Amino acid sequence: MLGGEVFPIHRLDKNVGGVMIYARTKQAAAALSKAVQEGTMVKEYVAMVHGTPTESGDWSDLLFKDSSKNKVFVVKKERKGVKKARLEFKTIRSGEDSLVRIRLHTGRSHQIRVQFSSRGFPLVGDHKYGSRDDKKEPMLFSCCITFPWKGEDKRFEALPDWADK
């Protein structure tokens, strides 16, 4: 096992699995954090949602986080604490529950969960945002991260078992 510090570059909600990026040096952490801030680190997710969204979409919303409830809401007007959120998605498989692939342009707390739920497509297993099924946690997975590193794009991918079914 290698010794030394490890620096997480981004976060995932507690009940979300998938690809994470860590740095082994402070210099690498600074460079990767800059990629996140500048939007050159591309994060993609897969999710299983209730219902059938359109074939693809580009959604922008204003989100407000109520920290006392650890819940996020879509709101109509900008005010203190409101943040802009944007994502794009493609429906991969549609039906009563649909598989979608999502590209985040912003990384807001609970962003994917609340943006889909607010349009009537809560994530399967996401009881906080409207799912009424028997799954124990949201079917949401960080499946791909791409970022520039030393002149070339690095890409890391993984899929959950449920995305293949």
What is each of the regions a protein language model found here?
Residues M1-R86, K90-G95, M139, R155, ...:
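RNA pseudouridine synthases
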Residues S109-K165:
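Pseudouridine synthases involved in rRNA/tRNA modification
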Residues V100-R103:
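Short histidine-centered loop motifs in beta-beta connectors
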